[in-house]
């Protein structure tokens, strides 16, 4: 059992994916609060927008790590979400700060539904990725 760079990448990805799961849960709860009108859209967007860039940067960091470790299958599984993150950030509304959510448009029913679906899809992806990284870490540690 040898400790390789690939094993380190899987361990770090496992820990950071746990943080991304919490980000996705926060995202889902925040948009549910907006849907049920428990919270002001301006306050909600002010709490959601600072989480966008760290989430995207953590995921991009995963992709760079797995590229350096030559874990091609793992990189291939992460590339569609990375491409989506890049597209989503490039097509964001024009605002003064970094973020995706504009308080003036977030209460539109179609945008709110889209953001909720996005949160649920990301939660599913991060949960599956968590268990895949756990399997990959065990496999790399045992097979070396």
Curated annotation (Swiss-Prot):
InterPro entries: Cornichon, Cornichon_conserved. GO terms for cellular component: endoplasmic reticulum membrane; endoplasmic reticulum-Golgi intermediate compartment membrane; ER to Golgi transport vesicle membrane; Golgi membrane. Highly expressed in heart, liver, skeletal muscle, pancreas, adrenal medulla and cortex, thyroid, testis, spleen, appendix, peripheral blood lymphocytes and bone marrow. Lower expression found in brain, placenta, lung, kidney, ovary, small intestine, stomach, lymph node, thymus and fetal liver. Expression is up-regulated in dorsolateral prefrontal cortex of patients with schizophrenia (postmortem brain study). One of its GO terms (molecular function) is signaling receptor binding. It is found in: Endoplasmic reticulum membrane; Golgi apparatus membrane. It is a multi-pass membrane protein. Residues 1-10, 78-122 are cytoplasmic. The chain crosses the membrane at residues 11-31, 57-77, 123-143. GO terms for biological process: immune response; signal transduction; vesicle-mediated transport. Residues 32-56, 144 are lumenal. The keyword Signal does not apply. Keywords: Endoplasmic reticulum, ER-Golgi transport, Golgi apparatus, Membrane, Transmembrane, Transmembrane helix, Transport. Disulfide bonds: none annotated. Interacts with AREG immature precursor and with immature TGFA, i.e. with a prosegment and lacking full N-glycosylation, but not with the fully N-glycosylated form. In the Golgi apparatus, may form a complex with GORASP55 and transmembrane TGFA. Belongs to the cornichon family. Involved in the selective transport and maturation of TGF-alpha family proteins. This is Protein cornichon homolog 1. It comes from Homo sapiens (Human).
């Amino acid at each position: 059992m040898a400790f390789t760079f690939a094993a380190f990448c899987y361990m770090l990805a496992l820990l950071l994916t746990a943080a991304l799961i919490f980000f996705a849960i926060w995202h889902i709860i925040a948009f549910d609060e907006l849907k049920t009108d428990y919270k002001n859209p301006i306050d909600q967007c002010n709490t959601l927008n600072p989480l966008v860039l760290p989430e995207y940067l953590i995921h991009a960091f995963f992709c760079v790590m797995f590229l350096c470790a030559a874990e091609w299958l793992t990189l291939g599984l992460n590339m569609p979400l990375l491409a989506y993150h890049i597209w989503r950030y490039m097509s964001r509304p024009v605002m003064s700060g970094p973020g995706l959510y504009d308080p003036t448009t977030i209460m539109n029913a179609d945008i709110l539904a889209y953001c909720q679906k996005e949160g649920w899809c990301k939660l599913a992806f991060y949960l599956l990725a968590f268990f895949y990284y756990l399997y990959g870490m065990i496999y790399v540690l045992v097979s070396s």
